[in-house]
Amino acid sequence: MTVTADPVTLMKQEVGKAAAALVKSGSIVGLGTGSTTAYTIQYLGDRLKSGELTDIVGIPTSFQSEVLSKQYGVPLTTLDAVDHIDIAIDGADEVDPHKNLIKGGGAAHTREKVVDYLANQFIVVVDSGKLVDRLGSVFAVPVEVIPMAITPVTNAIKQLGGKPELRMGVKKAGPVITDQGNFVLDVRFDSIDDPVNLEKILNNIPGVLENGIFVNCADIVLVGEVKDGQPLVRRL
């Protein structure tokens, strides 16, 4: 592990390490997407190399987590080859006091939702800046849409009071394309008072594959903080 003086990076490393420490030998592990979860994958690889951890297999939620797992020596499998997931570890863009989440900043929320909801235990890893009183306070709700339906879905979301914006690529001309080959609308709402209902309403729009509201699924939230220049991890 590369040592860095940056306290934010150190914090992410500590949260990732704390999550990796919860994985037991023989586990089937859902591997999330994002900068903090990347450290979890790295620490899982370290534990495997040292012999502290044995006989685990990971199920990646994105091309990013698949590439990192191969890089750090974490064996992989697919949902076709297993009948359960013991533990999933993933990040979030927002976490409310009820442990409801907004995810999808990396456009991987569809695969993440499949894996995270299947897991017997779902661990969320975030920094303290991701904690909010109400979902949608800072982050828009990502909605994955099949390309041919982008216009009718946009119109339907506007009728719900949402303000959708097509996510554009960085270092790529045109819109972001998900691992499933779809577009992402980032939708802002003035207030998300009932995330459970909003998740269902959005998913009932024809052409929507999945949205980034995750409700009633997180078992443990590990929160990283920096105090007096030192990284700390606490549990919600």
Curated annotation (Swiss-Prot):
- Per the UniProt entry, what is one GO biological process? D-ribose metabolic process
Q: What is this protein called?
A: Ribose-5-phosphate isomerase A
The record, for Pfam families, names: Rib_5-P_isom_A
Family annotation (HAMAP family):
Rib_5P_isom_A
Q: Name one GO molecular function term.
A: ribose-5-phosphate isomerase activity
Active-site residue numbers: E112 (proton acceptor)
Function of the molecule: Catalyzes the reversible conversion of ribose-5-phosphate to ribulose 5-phosphate.
Q: State which Enzyme Commission number(s) the record gives.
A: 5.3.1.6
The gene name reads: rpiA
**Subunit structure comment from the entry:** Homodimer.
UniProt KW keywords? Isomerase
Q: What high-level taxonomic lineage is stated for the organism?
A: Bacteria, Bacillati, Cyanobacteriota, Cyanophyceae, Nostocales
InterPro entries (alphabetical) = NagB/RpiA_transferase-like, Ribose5P_isomerase_typA_subgr, Ribose5P_isomerase_type_A
Record: residues binding substrate: T33, G34, S35, T36, D90, G91, A92, D93, K103, G104, G105, G106, K130
